[in-house]
């Protein structure tokens, strides 16, 4: 009886290259899709920060101690001293690290809190 040696099958270089190429294509597609999701997440976080800043500043205005102009001028101190938020100065930054803008509306009876980045993203 003849003994036959079983030959071990190995992966060829071409097969390896095909697998690596497919992994690269799939990884690239996932990275491309995640970029849009990260941008949407930053916009959402910034909008939430704007809403919280607005709420805290309007609660201070509603207490009757300060006018709207004084509230806007002292926004950093108001947010730092507020029991409604832990790190008030961080709330005044958007997700990209830029300062939020706090202004009075055209009628002068309300506060507008916004980020230049978010406005630019929504326009373009």
Swiss-Prot record:
InterPro entries reported for this sequence: N_methyl_site, Pilin-like
Disulfide bond residue pairs: none
Signal peptide annotation: 1-31
Keywords, comma-separated and alphabetical: Cell outer membrane, Membrane, Signal
SUPFAM superfamilies according to UniProt: Pili subunits
UniProt-annotated location(s): Cell outer membrane
Coiled coil residues, start to end: none
Topology within the bilayer: Peripheral membrane protein
GO CC annotations, alphabetized: cell outer membrane
Primary subcellular site in the record, as a coarse category: membrane
Protein name: Putative outer membrane protein CT_569
Native source species: Chlamydia trachomatis serovar D (strain ATCC VR-885 / DSM 19411 / UW-3/Cx)
